[in-house]
Amino acid sequence: MASRILMNIKEEVTCPICLELLTEPLSLDCGHSFCQACITANHKKSMLHQGERSCPLCRISYPSENLRPNRHLANIVERLREVMLSPEEGQKVDHCARHGEKLLLFCQQDGNVICWLCERSQEHRGHHTLLVEEVAQTYRENLQVALETMRQKQQDAEKLEADVREEQASWKIQIRDDKTNIMAEFKQLRDILDCEESNELQILEKEEKNILKRLTQSENDMVLQTQSMGVLISDLEHRLQGSVMELLQGVDEVIKRVKNVTLQKPKTFLNEKRRVFRAPDLKGMLQVFKELTEVQRYWVHVTLVPSHLSCAVISEDERQVRYQERIHQSFGKVKYFYGVLGSPSIRSGKHYWEVDVSNKSAWILGVCVSLKCTANRNGPRIENYQPKNGYWVIGLWNAGNYSAFQDSVKYSDFQDGSHSATYGPLIVPLFMTICPNRVGVFLDYEACTVSFFNVTSNGFLIYKFSNCRFSDSVFPYFSPMTCELPMTLCSPRS
């Protein structure tokens, strides 16, 4: 009986983690107790959130600071160790609690150690028994295998637990990124609508200002007409009310003035055909926005390559170029410009970059195979800006003429009385409702296309070169022309 009670007490003070008697026991809020080393090692595995952990047995969460030493339990363990190590108790453990005989046999049916009197009792009659020494090694090996199996299963369980936590963290990151992308895209859509609204209001305000100005002028004309008539009426009234001499003096001139008076009617604008506002094609705008977003996925970092032949000043970070007039030894003071190339060179793939051309009155940009423009006393020549010469570019001339440069057309040129045929580029006019401050360039080497986008106008396509013949590497191309304001390469976040 005493041994059974002792075993029950031992079970109560055994650590559920290491299955040994508790060492420096710590108790949780749920009432369970563990060795200090065991529960501390378990902290990392049972981390929940914000410093909270869970009990390995009941999974109830608890704050880290609520771990408290259990002195009473530690005293019980200490007393139990003393009892188990005493010779008397050791003798009691080795002897049958019922008969007092030594436990030398093992009953295979019941799985317990018994004494020789137990073997002969009615309870164990007919059971197969063996000496404890004979079965101890076998069961020790079986238990060792079972222990290894459980340890492996525990490792597998811990790995599964870690996998779940990792998947949970991964999902949180994905959802967070999706939220960020959704918010960013809807913000861009709202920006597009705000921009369209602002443009429409500016057009309306401009129309209002123009009409009111004309109406004000018309009103002033009517006031002058009324005042002129009032003066003439006063003259007539004075003559009628005065003497005969006053009546007849210059009367023919007055009558002539009255006959020449023509009532000028004010010009009205009610019947003028006004532009009717139509809501923007949201579907089309979204499609344009989608196309711009798609090509922006291929944004590359482009830098400018300095050239000693170019009258260009490139910034230290090689991201900005502006025109600077220089003195050439052969020509004297001559405005000449070759343009500058961008790096890297492109032999394959899809590439996108953006250029800020704000407030510039002239510029040319795109891609080219090499620099072929020739110096000219009158400024940069455009004869070579043609696809067949390796240039796929668009540009701005005279602060308002946007053009794309296609392959040459033949035209006649008369110089010094002689006739010659010149081949200039086919200049394709480009019409834009909103002038671009920022131009996007997209090169698809395999598709043989170069596209230009008006980023200022929500990414609408400006022009597209198709069936381009890229026989070799091509480079980004930039020419600020003779306008001293800079061209600046943009970054994705600018």
Swiss-Prot record:
Coiled-coil residues: 132-222
Pathway participation: Protein modification; protein ubiquitination
Modified residues (Phosphoserine): S86
Zn-finger (RING-type) residues: 15-59
InterPro entries the UniProt entry points to: B30.2/SPRY, B30.2/SPRY_sf, Butyrophylin_SPRY, ConA-like_dom_sf, SPRY_dom, TRIM/RBCC, Znf-RING_euk, Znf_B-box
Domain notes from UniProt: The B box-type zinc finger domain and the coiled-coil domain contribute to the higher and low order multimerization respectively which is essential for restriction activity. The coiled coil domain is important for higher order multimerization by promoting the initial dimerization.
Assembly mode: Can form homodimers and homotrimers. In addition to lower-order dimerization, also exhibits a higher-order multimerization and both low- and high-order multimerizations are essential for its restriction activity. Interacts with BTBD1 and BTBD2. Interacts with PSMC4, PSMC5, PSMD7 and HSPA8/HSC70. Interacts (via B30.2/SPRY domain) with HSPA1A/B. Interacts with PSMC2, MAP3K7/TAK1, TAB2 and TAB3. Interacts with SQSTM1. Interacts with TRIM6 and TRIM34. Interacts with ULK1 (phosphorylated form), GABARAP, GABARAPL1, GABARAPL2, MAP1LC3A, MAP1LC3C and BECN1.
Protein name listed in UniProt: Tripartite motif-containing protein 5
Gene it is expressed from: TRIM5
